Amino acid sequence: MIFMIQIPESTKINPINIHVANNIFNIYEWEIKNITNLIVNELNQNKSHQPDESNEIEKIIENEIKKNNILIFNKFLFPKLRFKLDNTPNILIISPTNEIKLTYSILLKQNLTIKEKEIIENKIEKKFNVSAIVLKIGGIAFYPSLIPKDMEHTKIINNTIHEWLHQYFSLYDLGQNIYKDNKMLALNETLVSYISEELANNIMINETQSTKIKTKEINSFNSEIRFTRSITDNLLSKNKIDIAEKFMLSQKNKLNDQGYQIRKINQAYFAFYNSYGNTPQSTNNILSKLKCIRTKNAKLNVFINKLKNINNFSKFENILNSDLDIKKCVN
């Protein structure tokens, strides 16, 4: 599977598409161009024997994957790990206003200005009475994987692993059922995030003092955004939509004043991040459950093999309930 991103309903015809038609990202055009370039580059490098920086990163990641035996038939690394550093698409996220729920998403062109994003959001919100937000994608499992070119080195490694894992899982039931429902989407994204962080940490062993300082800043943001999500959920559960939206706006302004660059916080913002159980914006508890399963499966490849053939969320729950120690850990 070439295409892997948070778009559970984008294969369906949706009236929203008509209103963003001029800004839709052309996946097929991108693939044709970049697969052609990939083949040409591979041939040129074979002739020159001079690997570039991307090749070096690919080799480092591939070695870590092989070391953990995340292989097809326990022998082959597939697909071959390849990525491209470039501008990534934007994504339009839709949620109802009375709850936080991802109901629709579609990729938009890369170079949208803030004003253009706001025009799209306002237009969709007024027309369909929904919450909408346009966000920048942090990576996407095209082939080669597309990773933002302005990312720092550690994030390039983490996000490249993340997108390769989507490609790997697409060969199995887990990845093939990512869009079955929001629970399967969240399971896929949370699992891939969990594994990619572990593999990236194995590669980036040496932490600097600046990383520790940054961690304190991240913890401050995490605490504030979790608080925002909790209060918002509570207000929406009481159908206090206007109050919830005013609260999210005030929290966005507060975070901006503290130096965090967030353009917009709304229901759609939280709906997007809710698929990623390792983020502070999410309230799904899948990550803690995955960690419980991991305690019984110390080797990463054994852990992956236990989960890769899940084709619906009830099978994941069966795994949680089938072992007494895992069940105790979860509860």
Regions found by a protein language model. Name each.
Residues Q6, Q45, Q50, Q110, ...:
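Residue-identity detector for glutamine
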Residues M1-L71, I293-N331:
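N-terminal low-structure segments adjacent to metalloprotease catalytic domains
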Residues W30, N37, E163-F169, R226-S230, ...:
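Generic structural signal for well-ordered, non-membrane alpha-helices
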Residues F3, F25, W30, F73-F78, ...:
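Phenylalanine-focused residue identity feature
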Residues I5-P15, A186-K240:
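Metalloprotease/metallohydrolase-associated module, dominated by Zn2+-dependent proteases
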Residues E53-K212:
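Acidic/His-rich structured neighborhood in mature extracellular/periplasmic domains
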Residues K214-N331:
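Pan-zinc metallopeptidase signature
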